[in-house]
Curated annotation (Swiss-Prot):
Name the record gives this protein: Calcium homeostasis modulator protein 3
Entry-linked InterPro entries: CALHM
Name of the encoding gene: Calhm3
Basic and acidic residues composition bias: residue spans: 277-286
Transmembrane segments: 21-36, 49-71, 99-124, 177-202
Organism: Mus musculus
Phylogenetic lineage: Eukaryota, Metazoa, Chordata, Craniata, Vertebrata
Length: 347
């Protein structure tokens, strides 16, 4: 159990591990889908190629799009490419690195499907049975061209009466299946050789640029996650404060209307503070939320989000905040506790 917990924590802390896990999951789903696929070639001249090539290429396209959708870095890459420069320059090298990483993971599942289809050979036989040269086979010598085309169209359907138990059908099917498997194994070997060379030759070159681009691509992912988490934290605190101010205002109104009753033996009403205890505790505890409480109106939140998109701060913690642009210079005043802040928030 501890091993699974450690593995889960590692996947949560590493975006690359999560993406690799999703990539492997898509590949496994691809194998499962193909193994459960019911392949039925139409065995018609005009539709064999359309059906065979469609089954060979359409699912890989869908799997490629799924790979792009589930990869968080694909969205970050487009956002980084299209965002305004602001106070942070855009590095095209990082964008190219992210694009390469996204494409490598998105192409894994489609490649698995294509290799399975080629090694199985059914799609290839259906798609190219009409393209076989009849002169390579002696059994077609006594047939007219029209009979040959009709016969070749029926090759994928071994139970058809026209080609059942025909040596010519077996020869054509065997020829196309061998050709399909040869192409599949060639692609497999090529992919393995390219991956082997990339892994073995990369340490032979300077790793500085690679490490920099990998670092900053991970940084952008983590930065966006932390920004989203901080926004959720601020939204929760914002809603909490608004509700507390609403109850505090209602308490004051009820007191003004004389509808509030003092508890027996309690503290006199004149000695009670109108400030909600939750706000007083948060203000005095110094729990590190002052940077969140400074944003206390809808206009300030909108300005903050707009500034984050249009003018991200520079990657220099020593830089003065005044150099980051207008930011939140025109913030609305923060209302004191007990006032009607919930009417000012307009949320």
């Amino acid at each position: 159990m501890d091993r699974f917990r450690m593995l889960f924590q590692h996947l949560q802390s590493s975006s690359e591990s999560v993406m690799n896990g999703i990539c492997l999951l898509l590949a496994a789903v691809t194998v499962k889908i193909y193994s459960s696929l019911d392949f039925n070639c139409p065995c018609l001249e005009r539709y064999n190629a359309l059906y065979g090539l469609g089954l060979l290429l359409t699912p890989p396209l869908a799997l490629f799009l799924c790979g792009l959708l589930v990869n968080r870095q694909s969205v970050l890459m487009v956002e980084e490419w299209r965002r305004p420069a602001g106070h942070r320059r855009k590095d095209l090298g990082i964008i190219r690195y992210m694009c390469s990483s996204v494409l490598q993971r998105a192409l894994a599942a489609p490649l698995v499907w294509i290799l399975l289809a080629l090694l199985d050979g059914k799609c290839f036989v259906c798609a190219f049975s009409n393209s076989v040269d009849p002169e390579k086979f002696l059994d077609f010598a006594n047939m007219t061209p029209r009979q040959v085309q009709l016969f070749l169209a029926k090759v994928p359907c071994k139970e058809d009466e026209l080609v059942k138990n025909s040596p010519a059908r077996k020869a054509v099917s065997r020829y196309l299946r061998c050709l399909s498997q040869a192409i599949g194994w060639s692609i497999t070997l090529l992919v393995i050789v390219v991956a082997f060379l990339a892994r073995c030759l990369r340490p032979c070159f300077d790793q500085t640029v690679f490490l920099q681009r990998r670092y900053w691509s991970n940084y952008m992912d983590l930065e966006q996650k932390l920004f989203d988490e901080t926004c959720c934290e601020h939204a929760r605190d914002f809603a909490h404060r608004c509700v507390l101010h609403f109850f505090a205002n209602m308490q004051s109104e009820l007191r003004a209307l004389g509808l509030r009753r003092d508890p027996a033996g309690g503290i006199p009403e004149s000695q009670e503070s109108s400030e909600p205890p939750e706000l007083r505790e948060d203000r005095d505890s110094g729990n590190g939320k002052a940077h969140l409480r400074a944003i206390s109106s809808r206009e300030q939140v909108d300005q903050l989000l707009s500034t984050w998109y249009s003018s991200k701060p520079p990657l220099d913690l020593a830089a003065s905040p005044r150099r980051w642009g207008p930011g939140l210079n025109h913030r609305a005043p923060i209302a004191a506790p007990g006032t009607k802040l919930c009417h000012q928030l307009n949320v």
